Amino acid sequence: MAALLRPARWLLGAAAAPRLPLSLRLPAGVPGRLSSVVRVAAVGSRPAAGERLSQARLYAIVAEKRDLQEEPAPVRKNSSQFDWALMRLDNSVRRTGRITKGLLQRVFESTCSSGSPGSNQALLLLRSCGSLLPELSLAERTEFAHKIWDKLQQLGVVYDVSHYNALLKVYLQNEYKFSPTDFLAKMEGANIQPNRVTYQRLIAAYCNVGDIEGASKILGFMKTKDLPITEAVFSALVTGHARAGDMENAENILTVMKQAGIEPGPDTYLALLNAHAERGDIGQVRQILEKVEKSDHYFMDRDFLQVIFSFSKAGYPQYVSEILEKITYERRSIPDAMNLILFLATEKLEDTAFQVLLALPLSKDESSDNFGSFFLRHCVTLDLPPEKLIDYCRRLRDAKLHSSSLQFTLHCALQANRTALAKAVMEALREEGFPIRPHYFWPLLAGHQKTKNVQGIIDILKIMNKVGVDPDQETYINYVFPCFDSAQSVRAALQENECLLASSTFAQAEVKNEAINGNLQNILSFLESNTLPFSFSSLRNSLILGFRRSMNIDLWSKITELLYKDERYCSKPPGPAEAVGYFLYNLIDSMSDSEVQAKEERLRQYFHQLQEMNVKVPENIYKGICNLLNTYHVPELIKDIKVLVDREKVDSQKTSQVTSSDLESTLEKLKAEGQPVGSALKQLLLLLCSEENMQKALEVKAKYESDMVIGGYAALINLCCRHDNAEDAWNLKQEVDRLDASAILDTAKYVALVKVLGKHSRLQDAINILKEMKEKDVVIKDATVLSFFHILNGAALRGEIETVKQLHEAIVTLGLAKPSSNISFPLVTVHLEKGDLPAALEASIACHKKYKVLPRIHDVLCKLVEKGETDLIQKAMDFVSQEQGEMTMLYDLFFAFLQTGNYKEAKKIIETPGIRARPTRLQWFCDRCIASNQVEALEKLVELTEKLFECDRDQMYYNLLKLYKISSDWQRADAAWTKMQEENIIPRERTLRLLAEILKTSNQEVPFDVPELWFGDDRPSLSPSSRSAGEDVTEKTLLSNCKLKKSKDAYNIFLKAEKQNVVFSSETYSTLIGLLLSKDDFTQAMHVKDFAETHIKGFTLNDAANSLLIIRQVRRDYLKGALATLRAALDLKQVPSQIAVTRLIQALALKGDVESIEAIQRMVAGLDTIGLSKMVFINNIALAQMKNNKLDAAIENIEHLLASENQAIEPQYFGLSYLFRKVIEEQMEPALEKLSIMSERMANQFALYKPVTDLFLQLVDSGKVDEARALLERCGAIAEQSSLLSVFCLRTSQKPKKAPVLKTLLELIPELRDNDKVYSCSMKSYALDKDVASAKALYEYLTAKNLKLDDLFLKRYAALLKDVGEPVPFPEPPESFAFYIKQLKEARESPS
């Protein structure tokens, strides 16, 4: 073995990239790391602080904006699907540090359904089957990986060496036993050549089982192929010898490493640590830890977590506490710890997992209401014994880490249908005095109800009785009665099993059940004898069903009269008239038109009996009933219902070309004849100016001074400025002022005067011109501000300090330009040009103090670093850190060191604990390097940011390849490709195409499948005669106007070209059409489109223009045209925007066009890139059906989707808010009533509370407070949907004039006032509406309750009080709103 390793010295020297990813540092099975296979680092280096699992970094890639070039449909679709999958997995990893099996399964199924998955998608899925699945056993993970491999291979994915390497990595992470020789044979059979990464992982596979002989064979292969032996190999051999029982040789590996020229790093020591931990040798572990502490190396939290796993897995949990004491628990390491906890529990080491959990710290400002929830949920999934899980819950609560641990566990148990666990937890909660509510049992009852399991129902009722919970009406009606033949048999069964309570709840449930079955006589008897208050609204839906199933009109009338006149049933608002009116409306609305027609006579009789009983209904409800009767084609009944209207409460309710000599002769002749010369004089002056004949122009002006006008002076001033004639320019300006003090020159002439006067040190005159611009409100455009910059920069380059300072001060003070970083550059430049670095730094700092900008700080720092000005560097960094934060300071210093070639110092900066990627800043430096061809600096940036947390590695290498392409350096590009593989980077398709282009240009083989991009030039071939130079300029002018958003000017150019029969490119027409559509110039856009289609073969609009066209067609109600546009765009494989498709669907719904909506649904099926939620179709199809009076069909479809066992949409995402809102806005009362019934049924029968909560919130938002209150009374569980209510409050608080809505919500659900998110939203809304009184009341209420108020809440309240001139009763938080928003967001996102 030593003989194989000693020659590694020269191999290592030849290695282009000796490092391996950090992901190769974990022992097998631990989340995020492999078995003792260690990352190679430079001597003394450590991974950047803040990094997570390396696999997590695979997904931390910022979604790219698509290239401007249009991609063909197959490529674009494949790429967009990859981005979608990446986004889903990335979000999960960012949020939790792991991936769930369900999410990975959904992404896998979506990938397969695309029909043409790509190699990148395969790589992404395979790499997700390892340690990112801590909630799955090792065998399940590997089985999943094999399933993905086989399925994608069937679908035609071509695997390359990166896929085999990914599979190897999964095997190692999952401790999968396999034959490395068979694996190599499999690769050979697929004609895939192994690379260095393959051999390194095969060595790790042998070493994991202690097979040193096998590892030696692979080392031999590597030697013959001249592959470098990296530290990862040495570290694997440490593990191999240890697992072979040879600890002496394991430790000797460190000596061999030194002989090979490598100083063992912390990764190698970590491998040795794990080896001793697996043997339970705590003494050796302590010695290694002590040795590393005394060296330049250090261990990170995640390293200690590996050691904990090694001890636990080997059966030595007694040493875990000692290792836990060494962990610092930095924020970035929390996800690693959480994943270790989950995996320990999965491996039946839940006690150790709980020990680690208890050691985790609470994040800053954490509310202690969800700490450890992830662990408890996983324990429920693993079906741990109830007594153990309850013990965990109590220990968490006693440690004040999770205030509602038992409640949360109960929630998980009910969701997972763990009856025994749920019962045990409920009993524990009851013992502690926590109220157990009936709806907690509904998920358990629902399963038995579906199978008509009477004994199961009885068992659950017994459990309810045992834990002291009385079933409510909904429980009986929805879950108990349906399992029996009659109410009597229910009563008998409950009595027999001693489950019938003495309260009236069961009797009231019986009444509802009788109503449902049409037994009206029993209902009447009950209502007459009832002594308890009973709400009419709670009976309404049931009575409607009862009335329809019984045709005894006398009973109809008697029940209605009783409910109308008896105060027990209509004592609450809105009163008896409204209650009966809505009941009649809903009764008729519940019937079909044929049913109403068949029962016309009985309804007439019913109305007349009500009249005799003196029952009244309001006028507005009467009108609604009339509309219904007209719709049902029974207008004859209107006169019969009219007699019920309460009349006492009725209320009712957009020159030809000439030479200068000719003009001068004409001018003299006119003067001699005594005729006006103004026009000719102006024409002559303009001509001389155009000829740049300043001397002659000034002579003409002097000769005819008495005849001069403002326009002539303006032209002369501009001419003198162009000729750098400050004296005459200033004199002419003074003459203009004497002639007409109110005259205003155009902006360009003022700017020209400032420039020439400043250049000639006439600062006061220049400042006076600036003051005049301000006084006369001269138009300041972006081009004007740019001109100011050039004036200042010119003075700076000339070294004119005072000129720069005074002109800048005047420009900014007068408000002619904002004090931006760009306009302030010259203040620093003037000192840099003079080499005065202290003054340059002071100028930059002064700008920040005065204007909050820090111009040219990078250039100043670079100069200071070059000169070695340590004191000034420290001063600069202290200032930046104080004003812009430590992270900004670190990046400034990092870039300065990179720019100046101080790479060791740059490395130290980027490895600072806690630093994380800032994509915008990194891209800024990349662009700077590319623009100035700084290859070495960019290469070092890419190298040093390898371990930077959340760094988009593909983006970094893409920038590097762009630079290599400029220099045609294919060798470096190829080396970059090797490094990308070693880092396990999943390249985007654009990166692969760029690399392939570099290699092909240099006649090199491309080692991967190149994603194809088909595109053609549809520019019409025009002969030279038809495209003159002048016409080309016209096209450029048109595009220039488009860029400036000048739609009218651009369209006029098009008209001119059209007359001349000049044809532009299709891109130009698409751009013009898009601009016209954005300006809502629909007719003109269609004109351009028609012309392009008739003159360019195959002309089509691009995605963006077609999307705009659809939106404009919808706005004009051209729905058929919009549908045709959408179909054409999809046929061209374009991807229309989400808003365009959504607006078309919504417009079709309001027209009741179900067929067209379903056609769109078929058209966009599989196009996940549009981002259309399935709820868009569900909501709008239902709305369209309701518009067609097909209410029952709409309700049935929604109910089926909600209650189906194979739900396409998870219940928590099944949002019906849009449907409810439109039904309320369109005043579709029958539909609203049926939706209300359906929503309540879903809540009562299936414990699905989102629909009824959405309805409640829409009623509140639309001002229907009474209806909302009644709904809340019927379904009290709405008040417990805290997450939905919080989201509603957040969205509402962002809209003006919505404070009353939030007030109403808090009145209906008072307990929300103590929710920190809700009261923060309330204050935000009050501040937005300037509602000081409400804000004061809220503040006083919260302070009286001694609730902790965050700084953002206090900042908003203080700002509101200051706006109205009232004193602030507390010290105002000093930072900006943005600061506190970010602070609060980070606090809430902190994992617990």
From Swiss-Prot:
This is Leucine-rich PPR motif-containing protein, mitochondrial. Gene3D superfamilies: Tetratricopeptide repeat domain (1.25.40.10). Component of mRNP complexes associated with HNRPA1. Component of the complex, at least composed of LRPPRC, BECN1 and BCL2; the interactions prevent BECN1 from forming an autophagy-inducing complex with PIK3C3. Interacts with CECR2, HEBP2, MAP1S and UXT. Interacts with PPARGC1A. Interacts with FOXO1. Interacts (via N-terminus) with EIF4E; the interaction promotes association of EIF4E with 4ESE-containing mRNAs. Interacts with exportin XPO1/CRM1; interacts both alone and in complex with EIF4E and 4ESE-containing mRNAs to form an EIF4E-dependent mRNA export complex. It comes from the Eukaryota. GO terms for molecular function: beta-tubulin binding; RNA binding; single-stranded DNA binding; ubiquitin protein ligase binding. Residues 931-1050 are annotated as: RNA-binding. It is found in: Mitochondrion; Nucleus; Nucleus, Nucleoplasm; Nucleus inner membrane. Signal peptide: none annotated. The keyword Isomerase does not apply. The modification Phosphoserine is found at S1025, S1026, S1028, S1137. Residues 1-59 form a transit peptide. Strongly expressed in heart, liver and kidney. Weakly expressed in brain, skeletal muscle and testes. The keyword Zinc-finger does not apply. Keywords: Acetylation, Autophagy, DNA-binding, Membrane, Mitochondrion, mRNA transport, Nucleus, Phosphoprotein, Repeat, RNA-binding, Transcription, Transcription regulation, Transit peptide, Transport. May play a role in RNA metabolism in both nuclei and mitochondria. In the nucleus binds to HNRPA1-associated poly(A) mRNAs and is part of nmRNP complexes at late stages of mRNA maturation which are possibly associated with nuclear mRNA export. Positively modulates nuclear export of mRNAs containing the EIF4E sensitivity element (4ESE) by binding simultaneously to both EIF4E and the 4ESE and acting as a platform for assembly for the RNA export complex. Also binds to exportin XPO1/CRM1 to engage the nuclear pore and traffic the bound mRNAs to the cytoplasm. GO terms for biological process: autophagy; mitochondrial RNA catabolic process; mRNA transport; negative regulation of mitochondrial RNA catabolic process; regulation of mitochondrial translation. The modification N6-acetyllysine is found at K151, K186, K225, K291, K462, K749. PROSITE patterns: PPR. It comes from Mus musculus. PPR repeats lie at residues 125-159, 160-194, 195-229, 230-264, 265-299, 300-334, 402-436, 437-471, 677-708, 709-745, 746-783, 784-820, 821-856, 953-987, 1030-1064, 1065-1101, 1102-1136, 1137-1175, 1176-1210, 1315-1349. One of its GO terms (cellular component) is nuclear inner membrane.
